[in-house]
Amino acid sequence: MDLLDAWDYFINEVRKFFKEKGYTEVSTPLLLDFPNLDSNVEPVKVEVLERGENKVKWLHTSPEYSMKKLLSRYKRDIFQITKVFRNNEWGRLHRIEFHMLEWYAVGCDYLYLIEELKQLLNKLFGFKEFEVITVEEAFKRHFGEGIPQEESSMKELLERKGIDFSEDEDWETLFYRAFIEVERHLGFNRPTFLINFPERLCALAKVRNGYAERFELFIKGIELANGWTEETNPEEVRKRLEREAKKRNLPLDEDFIKAHEDMPECAGCSLGIDRLFSLFLGKEELVSEFFRA
């Protein structure tokens, strides 16, 4: 099987998995009037000529906003395989342009999506055993202590472990400096699901009992998927997005917030298809001859 045959087989198996589970495949715009407000992700800004006027548009960093607008209207399980774009990303596992699988399950939570992902990984790789641990447990395993709750104590941890940081960095930035050291050790004996993120890292996940109902999937130290139980309260969504928009000086999509007025309870997940395909081929870096321009 050559590279093109392998891709054709792989992508059809992924698509068949969701079709057989009753998901509806959708297609949404790549070019948006407003950027995704994903923390730590830089959107690609473009200028276009529309109806004779120069306008600023944004290439989506994920299809989340458009898919949730569909969810609020149709209230059914949906999935999409699409190209997404993230500025200033290049490396062994990063490209500015890459394929993303995203799906939403109505009436379900993040634990349901974890079970679905287990089934997909079993179908593609034959995996039968999985590990599910909390972020707190992962920190204790790697650093010998739990997650520091203050900036000062997080800096002390980083200093003790010889991890570089800047004095002016906030808690979230400091956390991810430590988290990089944790994640590179995950998923070597079996795929690892890291669950229950600190509330401060909730993104648009529902928060219960002091933590975000959110997970990430790792295989061989590579992050493959990120999912959560969706926060459906429009006022809570507005509060979080306004905070992020102000911090990054980016415009806010009011229609996206309004869509949450009719949003069903659901859970959503995004998965890096190019990374998963590379692992499917037995590679631990992106198959560059297939994904480069």
Swiss-Prot record:
One GO MF term: ATP binding
Keywords from the named record: ATP-binding, Ligase, Nucleotide-binding
Superkingdom, taxonomy of origin: Bacteria
Transmembrane stretches, start-end: none
PROSITE patterns: AA_TRNA_LIGASE_II
Subunit-structure text: Homodimer.
Annotated protein name in UniProt: Elongation factor P--(R)-beta-lysine ligase homolog
UniProt organism field: Aquifex aeolicus (strain VF5)
